[in-house]
Amino acid sequence: MNKIIIFISIFFFISCTNSPKTKTGSEELDDTTNTKLDRAFTSFRIGEAQYLSEKRFTELLDLFDKYKGVTDEITFFTHTTHAPLTLDDFRQRVDVLKLRMEEVRNRGYRTGINILTTIGHHNENLDNSLKGDYTNMTGIEGDVSHGSYCPNNKNLQEYIRQLYQMTTEANPDYIWIDDDVRLGHMPIGYGCFCDNCLKIFEKETGARYSREGLNKAMNEGTVDEKLKLRKEWLQHNRNTIARLFVLIEETVHKINPDMPLGFMTGDRFFEGYDFGNWAKILAGPNNAPVMWRPGGGFYNDVNTSGLAGKSHDIGRQVSVLPKAIVSVQSEIECFPYQRLKKAANIVVLEASSHIAAGCTGAAFNVLSMYDEPLDEYEPLIARLHESRQFFDLMVKSLGRSALTGVNTLWNKDSYITGNLNNGNWVSAGNPVIGHDIYNIGLPACYSNQHAEVTILGKDNIYAFSKEEIKEILSRGVYMDAETLQYLNKMGFGEFTGFEVVKSENVDRIEKFSTHPLNGNFAGRERDNRQSFWKSSAYTLRKTNENTQVLSGLIDYTGTKVSDCTMGVFENKLGGRICVAGYYPWSFMENLSKSSQMKSVFRWLSKDSLPAYIASFHKMNLWVREPQDGKIALAFTNSSFDPAKDVTLMLQTENTKIKVYDMNCKETIIQSSGENGLYQKFIIPEVDPWQMRLVIL
C-alpha cells in the first residue's frame, strides 16, 4: 500500500441534540459513494412493556430528555415474543404506536417501528400467536418449527403484505425488518425444505428431489457434484429472501415511496450472504434509503472474548454492504435485559468496537422488558450519554472507509464447503475458521479485496475458482496443513512450497529454529498439550529449495521427531506463503509465539501491513484505508490488566499522531524511531477493556 500522507485531523464537537447531517440510507446503492459523516447514528429499541402504559412511556421519554443526545432515534418493537402475531393483535399494537410516535417527534427524536416477526423466529407463546393455513419452516429431515413459517407460502405472503401495509400506514419515519428473516430456526436448524420449496428448486434447476434424496445428494458423490448442488441451493435461498423483500418493498413504497427500510442480519452464510442485492431490492425503484443492523451473539459479559468475536462477525457483514448505506447501526443486545449481566463500561466498549469494525453507530436493545420503572437502567443511560461524544468522534474519523490488514478468507459461497468430505452439510456451522491471531495486535480485515495478508483455513478454498486461488497465492498467505493438502491436491503444489508427510496426535512440542523471523526466540518451545486440546501435529517436507523452516517438533524427551512443522516460501508468482502444522489457530498468547507471528505476517505482507501492535499485549486492532490523505485506526486492550508502553508500529512518514481515549481526551505522541517503512509510537498506558482512537 502507499505510504500514508501526513494529515492532522481537527476535531470539533457537534451538539448531540442534532441528527446526523446525512441521509439515513442509500444515495445510490453502489460501492463508489463515500458519504461524509459528522456523528454516529444511535437508537434505542423499546419493548411493548415500556410503551403500552402511558405512565411508563412518559417516564421513558423523560429519561431520554434528561440525557438529551444519548439517542437520535426511538424505535418500537411491535411485540415481545418470537412467533408471529395475529393481524388483529398486530393492528392493536400499531394503533398505539401511531400515537406514541407523534409524542416522540414532539420531543425532537426520529422514530420508527421494528417488526419483530415477519416470518417468525422460533417456538414461543404459540397459544397466542398466528395460526392458520401456513406452511411451517421445515428442516431437511421433515421436522418443523411451529413458531416460524416458510416465506414462499402464498398465504403467508398475504399476511406479510397486510403486516407491512398496516405498519406503513401508521406513518413511522422508518421501518426495520428483524433478523427472523433468515433460514435458521429453532428447533429444526436450517430450512426451508418444505414440499413447495422443493418444487421451486425444481423449477430453478430442473432437478427433482425428495427431502431424503436431496439430503443424500448434498452429502454424497464427488466433491464437484456436491459443490454444484450446494451452490444451487444457496442461490435458491438467496432467491427466497429476494422474493420476500420484493413483496415488502412494493407494499411499503406503494404507500410511501420514500420510506426508509432497514434490515437486521447476522452472519448469513446458509442464506447466501446476498446483502448487496437485497439492499438494492429494499431501496426500490425510487432508491429510498436503506439502513442495516449487523449483529450476532454476546448478550452478557461472562465471556469477554465474545465482544471482539462479535465485532469480527459484524465486520464481515459490513464489508459486503454498498458504501452508500451510511446508517449501519450495530445490534447492542443485553437480552434478557438483566442489568448485572453486562457492565455499562462493556456496553460502551462494545458499541465502540463495532464502530471500529465498520459500523457507523449502534442500536441499543438494553432496557427492561417489564412494566416496571427504569431506575436500575438510568446509570447505563448516563454512561452511554457520557460516551456519545466518543462514538461521534469515531464515526467522524472512520466513516465507511474500508478496513485493511489480515483477512480470513471467505465469500458468499463459503457455506458450500462445510463438511465437504464427511458429515451433514446442512449442520456444518460457520465456515470461517476461528483463531487467536486477531488478539495479538494484528489488524483485522474482512474483505479479500482490501487484504494485505490472507488466512486460509477449513475447506473454504473450494468456494473459489482456480483463477481466484492462483491470484490469492500470488500475495501473502498463512495456512494450516489441511489447506496445504487441499491446494496440492488441486494442482497448486508449485506455489505452496511444502507437502504433508505425516500427522501425530500425541506428545508433540513445537521448537523454534534459528531464523531471522524468530529473532531472539530461536530454541523456544511451545507445548499445547495434545492430550488436553486435541489437534494434530503435522510434519512438512520441502518441495522447493527456497523454502525455509521456522520450527520443528520434539517429544517429551527433547528428541527431534520432525525437522519442519512450520515454514515459509516465496513462490514464482511473488506470493509469500507460511504453512503452520502445529496449532495454527490457537495458543498464540505467549511472548515467543506472538512475536514470531507478527514477524511472519509483516514478512508475508512485504511490509504492507498498515499497522500492528509490536509490544506483548492482548490487543484487537482495526485500521482503515487512507481517505483524503488521512488515516484512522482503533485498538482495544482486551485484557483485565493495564497495558503499559503499548508499541504501535504504523506505516507512515508522519512522526506525530493524535491519540484519543474514550473520554475524548487528546494526547499527541511523537515517534520513538523508525523501522523500515514503519514509525514506532509508544502509548504509555491503556486501561483494561478500553479503546484508543488514533488519527493522523
Identify the residue ranges that each predicted region occupies.
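Sec-dependent N-terminal signal peptides
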Residues: I4-F13
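Hydrophobic targeting/anchoring helices
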Residues: E28, E48-Y51, Y67, D72, ...
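N-terminal substrate-binding region of glycoside hydrolase catalytic domains
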Residues: T32-V96
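Active-site mouth loops of central-metabolism enzymes
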Residues: S43-E59, S145-Y159, C334-A344
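Aromatic-lined substrate-binding rim segments of carbohydrate-active enzymes
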Residues: L61-F64, T78-G132, I248
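Active-site-adjacent "subsite" loops/lids of carbohydrate-active enzymes
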Residues: R110-A170, D179, P187, T205-H236
